[in-house]
UniProtKB/Swiss-Prot annotation:
Family, per entry: Belongs to the universal ribosomal protein uS10 family.
SUPFAM superfamilies: Ribosomal protein S10
Keywords from the UniProt entry: Ribonucleoprotein, Ribosomal protein
Keyword Magnesium: no
Biological role stated in the UniProt entry: Involved in the binding of tRNA to the ribosomes.
Subunit structure of this chain's protein: Part of the 30S ribosomal subunit.
Species in which this protein is naturally found: Mycobacterium tuberculosis (strain ATCC 25618 / H37Rv)
GO biological process: translation
Gene name, Swiss-Prot/TrEMBL: rpsJ
Any GO molecular function: tRNA binding
The protein, known as: Small ribosomal subunit protein uS10
Keyword Ribosomal protein part of the UniProt annotation: yes
Length: 101
């Protein structure tokens, strides 16, 4: 796999879970002998939802809820077969979405 690159994008609502997962991936890649770039923090996506507090009237009384989606990018340069095998066996939390390209 010489000259190739694996790009891993991580998404999660919890920044501690995504940082721990990124740290675990980087440690695994370095241990297997490939070089790694990252984790690069990408812009956090913030969704704000406005909800009327009252079920009937009082439209001026509203409540705001937000969801933040944290994202990280990790590039693995010149991965070895050992690196790919170790990445397939790594155990990450269910709250972290992993996209491998």
């Amino acid at each position: 796999m010489a000259g190739q690159k694996i790009r891993i994008r991580l998404k999660a609502y919890d920044h501690e879970a995504i940082d721990a997962s990124a740290r675990k991936i980087v440690e695994t890649v370095v241990r297997t002998g490939a070089s790694v770039v990252g984790p690069v923090p990408l812009p956090t996506e913030k969704n704000v939802y406005c909800v009327i507090r009252s079920p009937h009237k009082y439209k001026d009384s509203r409540e705001h809820f937000e969801m933040r989606t944290h994202k990280r990018l990790i590039d693995i340069i010149d991965p070895t077969p050992k690196t790919v095998d170790a990445l397939m066996r790594i155990d990450l939390p269910a709250s972290v979405d992993v996209n491998i390209q």
